[in-house]
Amino acid sequence: CPHFIELGDSRRFLNIEVSRPMVRIKNLVHTSWQTASTSLESRVVISAREVFDVFCEYGETTCHPAENGSYVICIRDTCNVHIDNYYGLHGWGFQGHHGIKGLYGNRNTFNRVDFHSFGYDVFFKDLTVKGRQINLQGGNEWSIEK
């Protein structure tokens, strides 16, 4: 299991930041027991921004539930993202923010799926949403199947 150190005292703590295209993250297990008094709402486990071809496979993230947000995976302005076999009960689960084109997910469990601004061509198969909701904004093709 990899270990990551959080640096800084800002509102946003990232464990993994994807800043180049064609990245594969496999077999990640992340356990975090922060509480609301330690900025739980500002945490993101995996973040990708302005890249393409991102593959997240076989991962699990767990922590104390949070009402006010914390995302397992946060994707911004990115194309061709694949998320397969993820179990994430870390605040709100998955967030697509400011634009995703081509999101593909298979066999995932999230506490919440949340799109801010827009998502285009989004396909989830065998998706389980536990606890919260799905917030969709965007267009073109959407397909969400159990």
Predicted regions and their residues:
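Extracellular/periplasmic carbohydrate-active domains that bind, remodel
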Residues: C1-K146
